[in-house]
Amino acid sequence: LEAVSHASDTHYGYGDSAAKEIGGDVLKHAEMVHTGLKEYKDVDKXGPVAKELSGLPSGPSAGSGPPPSALFAQIHQGESITHALKHVADDEKTHKNPADKAQSGPVRXGPKPFSASKPGISPSPKPVTKKWRXENXENVSNLVIDDTELKSVNSTLQIKXXINSISVDNYKVPXISINKXDGRHIYLSKNSLDCEIVSAKSSEMNVLIPTEGGDFNEFPVPEQXKXIWNGQK
């Protein structure tokens, strides 16, 4: 506080000398500064900081609780601390008076947990025009497409993603297209020996041709092709 007071007195001296030399509006500003410093000094002399430094009491602190010794004395009472509790009669108890419990209003239950429904399984896919659609099938070993017509012509059966096996009966297959497949076995009947097999980005493919005895002869499909330029193509 003494340092602040000394600095303000020094500013008074320099401010007065500068104001006299310059004059004009500077005198008005100097008077405003002097007034502000005077008010600061008046407040500083009677403020809480000055009282603390001078040793004067600054007033009791609000909300002061009982001393810690009284709290520990209550804790060490043990079972006798319950003697101060008031006895509650039966007619004042809520669980023995259903009427009072009903007046308190219904208890709101929280939202029920959401349970996602599992996708259904369509054991018999329905045809869409000339295409059959099988979806949401899991662990189904007897998936059969039976809603068909005999002697179908210009029909297309397209299968995407993974599949274990597929059988096509009573159809003459003119072409089989396989793309991005690994480990495929194609069984051809006697009526489909003239079909064309087109494969791309596939490996481990075998074509099985029926024999007179009912068995099949296995022929691998080449995974690599050799191209030779003959001068024109």
Swiss-Prot record:
Subcellular location field: Cell membrane
InterPro entries xrefs: Adenylate_cyclase-assoc_CAP, Adenylate_cyclase-assoc_CAP_C, CAP/MinC_C, CAP_C_sf
Single GO molecular function: adenylate cyclase binding
Biased composition (Low complexity): 53-64
Keywords for the protein's UniProt record, in alphabetical order: Actin-binding, Cell membrane, Isopeptide bond, Membrane, Methylation, Phosphoprotein, Ubl conjugation
Pfam family, any one: CAP_C
Modified residues (N6-methyllysine): K101
GO biological process: actin filament organization; cAMP-mediated signaling; cell morphogenesis
SUPFAM superfamilies: C-terminal domain of adenylylcyclase associated protein
Region (Disordered): 43-71, 91-129
GO CC term (a single one): plasma membrane
Cross-link Glycyl lysine isopeptide (Lys-Gly) (interchain with G-Cter in SUMO1): where in chain: K151
Main location group: membrane
Cell membrane found in the keyword field: yes
Residues carrying Phosphotyrosine: Y14
C-CAP/cofactor C-like domain segment(s): 173-221
Residues bearing PTM Phosphoserine: S17, S104, S115, S122, S124
PROSITE patterns named among the record's database cross-references: CAP_2
Topological relation to the membrane, as annotated: Peripheral membrane protein
Family membership: Belongs to the CAP family.
Quaternary structure note: Homodimer. Binds actin monomers.
Role according to the record: Directly regulates filament dynamics and has been implicated in a number of complex developmental and morphological processes, including mRNA localization and the establishment of cell polarity.
Protein name (Swiss-Prot/TrEMBL): Adenylyl cyclase-associated protein 1
Organism name: Sus scrofa
Gene that this polypeptide is encoded by: CAP1
